[in-house]
Amino acid sequence: MGKQKRSENTYTKINTIFFRDENNIIMPYDEFVAPEFEWLRNCKFDADEKIDGTNIRIEVTRQVEDNAIVWSVVFKGKTDKATITTKLDKYLKETFTEDKILNALGLSKKMIILDENGNATQEMKDKKWVNIDNGELTNEFDISRVPEMYTLYGEGYGAGIQSGGYYREDVAFIGFDVKVDDMYLLRVQRDDIFNKLGVDIVPYIGQFTIDEAIEFVKKGFNSKIAKKEHLAEGLVLRTPMELKNRRGERIIFKVKTCDWNKYFNKYGTYDKVEQIKNKFLK
């Protein structure tokens, strides 16, 4: 089965920063795959533990019906055509009901737009979904200020999902990002929403430069959430202020434990060896 076609709201693709050689092994002592990583080499990145699971999206979308905004909630996999296992789907829908999700976002199923006088309701003003004149809120509702979609991204993980049996004997959901329309929220905003929803958040490991992160993963570290002692999958790193590159893409990358294991198993050392770059793989 080939790779699934990415959907419009599929989570940001997270690449490694290394090129690969003709044996599909990382080339950790050569140039990085993108020039911005060299420029940012000595900057501190926020690092989260990489979880081995299946990507899950919780999409909250709006519709305008008569005099109200109506919100709907759906659960999706990595792509729109991806299937969620029966066990995980049951867990998600029973644990994170529509009301819980909307409450965590400060929304209600049906939000009245205008009062009996034709002015924006207090709820619309509180949300600042109204026109603003010289810094003052007006009584005029402004639909362009209402987000079209909130997306909560996370990982379904646990027994029966990838090799995640060492994490836990059942299945669960752990969050790692929240997006409002096309903007990913900062860590503090993300955490606030997941905490209100009662969702565990991927473990924050700390701040690292790129070289520090590479060395940290190469040495290996245990998963912070696994019930059984087990090496973590690696790190996912991003800039604290969610910077983007010149193509408008998020600066986010991963360093994987298994890549270093494969390097050692192939070459018998963690030191630099002669490698020939694979022109087709990263």
Predicted regions and their residues:
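Core nucleotide-handling region used for phosphoryl-transfer chemistry
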Residues: 1-282
